[in-house]
Regions:
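C-terminal engagement/docking regions of AAA+ P-loop ATPases
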Residues: 5, 167-173, 186, 190-256
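Hydrophobic face of alpha-helices
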Residues: 83, 173-176
Length: 256
C-alpha cells in the first residue's frame, strides 16, 4: 500500500521499483461492462494472465475508488463479487512473491480493511512533500536529470529561500518544464538563473490546504514504517492524530 498526498510520485516510485528488481509492471484498467456477468468474466481472464506472467507487479492507481468495497449497492451485486474476487486472489499464498500488488491512493482511510490487512498489503509505505532544504534540492536535481534538462549552475538554496519555495514534486516538475519553454522562447541554449526565477515567481500551484493536510495525516496514520514518516509526526500521539483527521473531515463535509 503506497499512500501520500497528491504529487509525491507514488506511481513513479512503483514503476521505478519494479524496473529495479527486474519484473514487468502492469496497470489495472477498467474491465467493467454494463452486461451482467461480463465484468466478472473479464476479471477472471485478467487474473489468469497475471498467473501466466508471474513474476509480475500489479499497480492499481486510485485504489480507493477503483476497488470499491463489499457494501456497494445498485449493480445487482457485481461490485461485491468483483471486490471479493480480487481480495481472495490477493490473499492467496500460492502467488505470494510472484504477483506483487501495489495499491496506490491519496486516501488509504477509504480502503476497506479487508484489502489493507497483512497477507494482502504487507507493507504500508507513505510518501510526503520534501520538508528540509536538502530534500528539496535533491528532488530538484533528480527531476532535472529525469527531464534531461540543461540548466545553468545556480544556488538553488538561496533561490528556494528567496521565493518561499514549498511545492510538491509534481509542482517542481511543472516549474522545470515551464522554465524550459521560457528558455526556448528567449533563445537560450540552457535554462538560465533568470528563466528559473521568473518561472518560480510566476507559478501559482493549485492550493487545497485542508485536503492536502488530510491526505498527509491519513498517510502518517497508515504507514507501518516510522522511518518513512516526517520527523514532526514520528512521536505524535495516535489519538491526537485520529482526532485531527476527524476535525479535517468535518471541515470538508466528510463523514468521520
Amino acid at each position: 500500500l503506497i499512500s501520500g498526498p497528491v504529487g509525491t510520485g507514488k506511481s513513479f516510485i512503483v514503476t521505478a521499483f519494479a524496473g529495479d528488481i527486474g519484473i514487468p509492471i502492469v496497470k489495472f484498467r477498467n474491465f467493467r461492462s454494463k452486461w451482467q456477468g461480463v465484468s466478472e468474466s473479464n476479471l477472471e481472464k485478467i487474473l489468469n494472465i497475471l498467473k501466466a506472467m508471474a513474476p509480475v507487479g500489479v499497480m492499481i492507481d486510485e485504489a480507493d475508488a477503483f476497488l470499491g468495497d463489499r457494501n456497494q449497492e445498485g449493480d445487482s451485486g457485481t461490485s461485491n463479487r468483483i471486490f471479493a474476487q480480487i481480495a481472495s486472489f490477493m490473499g492467496n499464498t500460492e502467488y505470494r512473491g510472484k504477483i506483487i500488488w501495489f495499491l496506490i491512493t491519496c486516501r488509504p482511510d477509504l480502503l476497506p480493511i479487508d484489502l489493507k490487512r497483512q497477507g494482502r498489503a504487507e507493507e504500508h509505505l507513505a510518501l510526503f512533500y520534501p520538508e528540509t532544504m536538502e530534500e528539496k534540492e535533491d528532488l530538484f536535481y533528480t527531476l532535472v536529470q529525469k527531464l534531461k534538462l540543461k540548466i545553468q549552475k545556480v544556488n538553488i538554496t538561496d533561490m528556494f529561500k528567496k521565493n518561499h519555495f514549498d511545492f510538491s514534486g509534481a509542482d517542481i516538475e511543472s516549474i522545470l518544464i515551464r522554465a524550459k519553454f521560457l528558455a526556448t522562447m528567449n533563445n537560450h541554449i540552457f535554462i538560465t538563473k533568470g528563466d528559473l526565477e521568473e518561472t518560480i515567481q510566476d507559478f501559482v500551484p493549485p492550493s487545497y490546504p485542508h485536503e492536502i493536510e488530510l491526505q498527509t495525516l491519513v498517510a502518517v496514520l497508515e504507514c507501518t514504517s516510522r522511518e518513512m514518516v516526517p520527523k514532526r509526526f514520528q512521536n505524535l500521539d495516535r489519538d491526537k492524530l485520529i482526532s485531527a483527521i476527524g476535525q479535517l473531515k468535518a471541515l470538508l463535509g466528510e463523514q468521520a
